[in-house]
UniProtKB/Swiss-Prot annotation:
Protein name (Swiss-Prot/TrEMBL): Respiratory burst oxidase homolog protein A
Keywords: Calcium, Cell membrane, FAD, Flavoprotein, Membrane, Metal-binding, NADP, Oxidoreductase, Peroxidase, Phosphoprotein, Transmembrane, Transmembrane helix
Annotated transmembrane regions: 400-420, 436-456, 483-503, 536-556, 584-604, 760-780
Region entry Disordered, spans: 1-36
Gene field: RBOHA
Compositional bias of kind Polar residues: 13-36
One Pfam family recorded for the sequence: FAD_binding_8
EC number: 1.11.1.-, 1.6.3.-
Protein residues bound to Ca(2+): D289, N291, D293, R295, E300
InterPro entries in alphabetical order: Cyt_b245_heavy_chain, EF-hand-dom_pair, EF_Hand_1_Ca_BS, EF_hand_dom, FAD-bd_8, FAD-bd_FR_type, Fe3_Rdtase_TM_dom, Fe_red_NAD-bd_6
Length: 963
């Protein structure tokens, strides 16, 4: 019989009068034919789970009332479509002493079956009854003797009273649980198990051929030594685990060796890659069962937990191995025999999903993907190209019109100068080389002015809040800055190249007649030599600019700024943020020299024709004004450090007082300077406090020399942790050592500050990249609490019949403007995905995660933590970690990895499934995807946004943080 997913059907045993009855055998020791003896006999209620694949799982057997199929005699019970419920008087009379199941009324049973049973239940009942009778008959025969002396009810009674045969009762109880576990293992659960306990990940090795090649490299005298086993099978990162695996496989063969032959290696490999779940389970059991007695004690469980924790780089879990070993024993050994067996370990592995129910909202299946992507008909190549073109225009129209306008301006300036110099007499000698050089020079003047505008951060921050943000992509200001820099490099090559290798040689080699006729008014009566042109004001200033810009542009590239290129000392100082920061200040000299260069021109003599200063005047003044504003504002924003903490992963948290005039939005950042480290360097950091907080906070991870020195300075000011407290270095206002002075400047706009525009948020942070979104989560949480308070206020007001009370509450309601209500209700859901490599990283924002879990009763915010140091679910190295995680959360409500109520997932997220889930849950919504982290994931997320935007009406808009 096919049942509805997620529902259960309940059947009870009955007298077996004919094969037409859907019944199970009565409990051992009862007379199935004696209906009048219900008061003295014990019947069971069998709870079955009917799966979609027509398999049946026996969940429990409890005392219950009697139900018959195909027996609708009014004299004996009430029938429902072939199902009758008998309620003997004897059972009714004893209901007061029976369990809650026994006290269920007939009306409750009628309601339950009317809701759960479908028409197909009656049609398939006869067939199912035969299978169930046979299964229960086998169950009764196999445990008849044990059940006569030990019933489920009598076991617990004996346990309380403490009579006699405690060990026998415990063994009988375990035997009963084992029988149930065997019935519970169906085809569906076995199929799920095939995905678990994999010793070799598919992406780690390409099968036996690669292992064979590794053997050839590592073998000595034709044997592979135990110490090289991990590297040979592709488990180099989990050497301890691999060595235990080697020992377990050797023990099964009664071998105690330190080396194996190629043939033995092949046998080992065949076993650990066996597709049979039972085979893999036995190997895992053997790894734990080191004394080979077929039983696992608590100490052995502790050892394998420590081994798994070490393989997954979970140092804290290793420290708490004893506690979690006791937790597993408590769950699997309720009889307290002191050991567990293979079948109990199997039960825990197969039923771990039951304990993970708390995270079902976090682990969405791929069904959503199939629902959204199935049925998409294949389109012709022309149709696909046109769709992509339309989408690209819709997605990038802001960038396109800005770039097109910029390119058209450069083309116009180039052509204007090109034709202007074509009319000059110098063209007759220098030719088109002169025209190209002058056209490029005009674009250089324009771009040298334009490149300053995207880095006028205060101006950009202001413009973000205006209507202009609807037409100009201010989020791409840094990218546009880099694009203009590339155009400047191109212009320099054209301008300087044509002068040095083309028109200068033509000038010095021109015959005297042409020189006197066309160039004497520009270069004087004496024809210059090449060195005269180079050492002149124009030549010297040009060379100086080229050298300084080459240095600044080179050190600003990603390879140098991110220290991707390694140099030996002392040249290592040429890489990193400091090299970028200081080299960029060379451009101040470049602009001064550029004005001089544009004043002393060979072919232009009228001052109003020398336009370089005209291009630069406004941008240079604007940028200089911003730098001046930063200087004075940093002195105006006096802050007092309130709290300092240094977390695992070399993360420094600074909490400081909030200046009264410092107003910011969630997602924005500010610049920080510490004179004790450097009196000149300013570094940007995302603000992690919410706008409503009465303090400012930032989280700084040690990545470069400045952050390293900053951490050292504050570490010296921090106090050592007291005994019994967390091992964090902390300092506050009461610390005896004075804290270093800190200067701030900002706030400055960032893409994440526009999160309120979207119906749904998808926030993705890698490591310290989570910082821009912590402030957003805090702000959302505050809005949630405010919204609930407003709803309660409105509810109290509407339900209050007292006019005086209503009058007193009316002003409070009037304060809630429609505009404010609309802004708080705009974002309906937020999904935060935090991916990190280290377990200690979760301490950074532990308080925020607990606060969200406690206050977000409506489930507006979903938090997803991913720890990439742990092997993915299904890997044998993380199997026990997953079990402990599930058990501990089911019992205590706390995740063992993060220390919060938010479950930690292992390995990396499947981003396609994440997008599919979000698409399914929020059809026709505008979803903002905000990302902060490594560029490689940004490309994947951007690509997925484009892909899913072409599938339906839901729109994903991707934004990446730039500093």
């Amino acid at each position: 019989m096919r049942g509805l997913p997620g529902h259960e059907r309940r059947w009870t045993s009955d007298t077996v009068s004919s094969g037409k009855d859907l019944s199970g055998e009565s409990s051992p020791g009862t007379d199935s034919g004696n209906i009048s003896g219900f008061a003295s006999e014990e019947f069971v209620e069998v709870i079955l789970d009917l799966q979609d694949d027509d398999t049946i799982i026996l969940r429990s057997v409890e005392p219950a009332t009697v139900i018959n199929i195909d027996a609708s005699d009014p004299a004996t019970g009430v029938g429902i479509g072939g199902v009758s419920i008998e309620t003997p008087a004897s059972l009714t009379s004893t209901s007061g002493t029976r369990s809650p199941t026994m006290r269920r009324s007939t009306s409750n049973k009628l309601r339950q079956f009317s809701q759960e049973l479908k028409a197909e239940a009656v049609a398939k009942a006869k067939h199912f009854s035969q299978e169930l009778k046979a299964e229960l008959r086998r169950f009764s025969w196999s445990h008849g003797h044990a059940s006569r002396t030990f019933s489920p009810a009598s076991f617990f009674q004996n346990a309380v009273v403490g009579t006699g045969n405690g060990v026998d009762s415990a063994l009988a109880a375990r035997a009963l649980r084992r029988q149930r576990a065997q019935l519970d293992r169906t085809r569906s659960s076995a199929h799920k198990a095939l995905r678990g306990l994999k010793f070799i990940s598919n992406n780690k090795t390409n099968g036996w051929n690669e292992v064979e090649n590794n053997f050839a490299k590592l073998a000595k005298d034709g044997y592979l030594y135990r110490s090289d086993f991990a590297q040979c099978i592709g488990m180099k990162d989990s050497k301890e685990f691999a060595l235990e695996l080697f020992d377990a496989l050797s023990r099964r063969r009664r071998l105690k060796v330190d080396k194996i032959s190629k043939e033995e290696l092949y046998e080992y490999w065949s076993q650990i890659t066996d597709q049979s779940f039972d085979s893999r389970l036995q190997i895992f059991f053997d790894m734990v069962d080191k004394n080979e007695d077929g039983r696992i004690g608590e100490e052995e469980v502790k050892e394998i937990i420590m081994l798994s924790a070490s393989a997954n780089k979970l140092s804290r879990l290793k420290e708490q191995a004893e506690e979690y070993a006791a937790l597993i024993m408590e769950e699997l050994d309720p009889e307290r025999l002191g050991y567990i067996e293979l079948w109990q370990l199997e039960t825990l592995l197969l039923q771990k999903d039951t304990y993970l129910n708390y995270s079902q909202a976090l682990s969405y299946t791929s069904q959503a993907l199939s629902q959204n992507l199935q049925g998409l008909r294949k389109r012709s190549p022309i149709r696909r190209m046109s769709t992509k073109l339309v989408y690209s225009l819709q997605e990038n129209w802001k960038r396109i019109w800005v770039l097109v306008l910029w390119i058209l301006i450069m083309i116009g300036l180039f052509l204007w100068k090109f034709y202007l110099y074509k009319q000059k007499s110098a063209f007759q000698v220098m030719g088109y080389c002169l025209l190209t050089a002058k056209g490029a020079a005009e674009t250089l003047k324009f771009n040298m002015a334009l490149i300053l505008l995207p880095v006028c951060r205060n101006t950009i921050t202001f413009l973000r809040s205006t209507k202009l943000s609807c037409f100009v992509p201010f989020d791409d200001n840094i990218n546009f800055h880099k694009t203009v820099a590339a155009a400047i490099v191109t212009g320099i090559i054209l301008h300087a190249g044509n002068h040095l290798v083309c028109d200068f040689p033509k000038l010095i080699h021109a015959n005297n007649t042409n020189y006197q006729k066309y160039l004497v008014n520009d270069f004087g009566p004496s024809q210059p030599q090449y060195i005269d042109l180079v050492k002149g004001v124009e030549g010297v200033t040009g060379i100086i600019m080229v050298i300084l810009m080459a240095i600044a542009f080179t050190l600003a590239t990603r390879w140098f700024r991110r220290s991707l290129i390694k140099f030996p000392k002392p040249f290592d100082r040429l890489t990193g943020f400091n090299a970028f920061w200081y080299s960029h200040h060379l451009l101040i000299i470049v602009y001064i020299v550029l004005i001089i260069h544009g004043t002393f021109l060979y072919l232009v003599h009228n001052w109003y024709s020398k336009t370089t200063w005209m291009y630069l005047a406004v941008p240079v003044l604007l940028y200089a004004g911003e730098r001046t504003l930063r200087f004075f504002r940093s002195g105006l924003y006096t802050v007092r450090l309130l709290k300092v903490a240094i977390y695992p992963g070399n993360v420094l948290t600074l909490q400081m007082s909030k200046p009264p005039q410092f107003r910011y939005k969630s997602g924005q950042y500010m610049f920080v300077q510490c004179p004790a480290v450097s009196p000149f360097e300013w570094h940007p950091f995302s603000i992690t406090s919410a706008p409503g907080d009465d303090y400012l906070s930032i989280h700084i991870r040690q990545l470069g020399d400045w952050t390293q020195e900053l951490k050292r300075v504050f570490s010296e000011a921090c106090e050592q942790p007291e005994a019994g407290k967390s091992g964090l270095l902390r300092a506050d206002e009461n610390t005896k050592t004075s804290l270093p002075k800190l200067l701030i400047d900002g706030p400055y706009g960032a893409p994440a500050q526009d999160y309120r525009k979207y119906d749904v948020l998808l926030l993705v942070g890698l490591g310290i990249g989570a910082t821009p979104f912590i402030s957003i989560l805090k702000d959302l949480l505050k809005n949630i609490v405010t919204m609930e308070e407003q709803a309660d206020l409105v509810s109290d007001f509407s339900g209050n019949s007292d006019m005086s009370a209503a009058t007193s509450e009316q002003p409070a309601l009037n304060k809630i403007s429609p505009k404010k209500r609309k802004s708080t209700l705009k974002t309906t859901n937020a999904y935060f995905y935090w991916v990190t490599r280290e377990q200690g990283s979760f301490d950074w924002f532990k308080g925020v995660m607990n606060e969200v879990a406690e206050l977000d009763q409506r489930g507006v915010i979903e938090m997803h933590n991913y720890l990439t140091s742990v092997y993915e679910e299904g890997d044998a190295r993380s199997a026990l970690i997953t079990m402990v995680q599930a058990l501990n959360h089911a019992k205590n409500g706390v995740d063992i990895v993060s220390g919060t109520s938010v479950r930690t997932h292992f390995a990396r997220p499947n981003w396609r499934k994440v997008f599919s889930k979000t698409l399914t849950k929020h059809a026709n919504a505008r979803i903002g995807v905000f990302y902060c982290g490594a560029p490689i994931l940004a490309k994947e997320l951007s690509k997925l946004c484009k892909e899913f935007n072409q599938k339906g009406t839901t729109k994903f808009e991707f934004h990446k943080e730039h500093f």
